[in-house]
């Protein structure tokens, strides 16, 4: 499992796939990102860089959590320091809102929030929980502004080391795991949204 944004930081050129508001709900995600042209184009770009994007999974829509104040209008974002991934589209989005984006690694996010380096976090509710920051966040704003995809990926070298039968079995298992992960991650995120 690897987030497409993580792959972008290594190979570049993938940022078009998560432009703000390009996809606004999971029906669109399923049609274009999981089963459609976005998946097809990402798969080609991965292959051009020696990677096999075996099956799409899930990383959910990005939201904004912070410890300072509720966000009821764009003006409320002014001056908030928000942890974002090292993705230009995320940084530009928060800059346009008047916030101060801070590109900080996922592994350093909790410490940055606890130390006051940032006031908030941009990520999915599911990932905020996984990062350990959801319990620290006082206010969640459901922006749903950007879908963040992921995939089960392997190197071309590993893929080519398998027989055709092994590749088919690997692909089937990856497709099943991706579908299972999407279903459970979306259900878990919906449960978390109902309590935040």
Mark where each language-model region is.
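N-terminal secretory/targeting leader peptides
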Residues: 1-28, 37, 44-196
């Amino acid at each position: 499992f690897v987030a497409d944004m993580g792959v972008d930081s290594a190979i570049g050129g993938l940022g078009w796939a998560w432009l703000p508001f390009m996809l606004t709900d999971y029906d669109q995600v399923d049609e274009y990102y999981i089963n459609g042209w976005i998946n097809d184009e990402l798969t080609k770009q991965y292959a051009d860089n020696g990677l096999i994007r075996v099956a799409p999974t899930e990383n959910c829509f990005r939201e904004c959590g912070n410890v300072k104040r509720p966000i009821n209008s764009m003006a409320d974002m002014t001056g908030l320091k928000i942890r974002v991934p090292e993705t230009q589209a995320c940084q530009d989005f928060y800059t346009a809102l008047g916030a101060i984006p801070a590109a900080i690694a996922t592994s350093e996010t909790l410490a940055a929030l606890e130390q006051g380096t940032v006031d908030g976090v941009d990520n999915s509710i599911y990932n905020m929980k996984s990062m350990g920051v959801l319990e620290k966040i006082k206010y969640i704003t459901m922006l749903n502004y950007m879908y963040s995809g992921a995939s089960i990926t392997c190197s071309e070298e590993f893929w080519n080391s398998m027989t055709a039968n092994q590749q088919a079995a690997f692909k089937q298992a990856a497709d099943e795991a991706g579908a299972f992960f999407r279903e459970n991650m979306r259900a878990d995120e919906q449960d978390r949204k109902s309590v935040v």
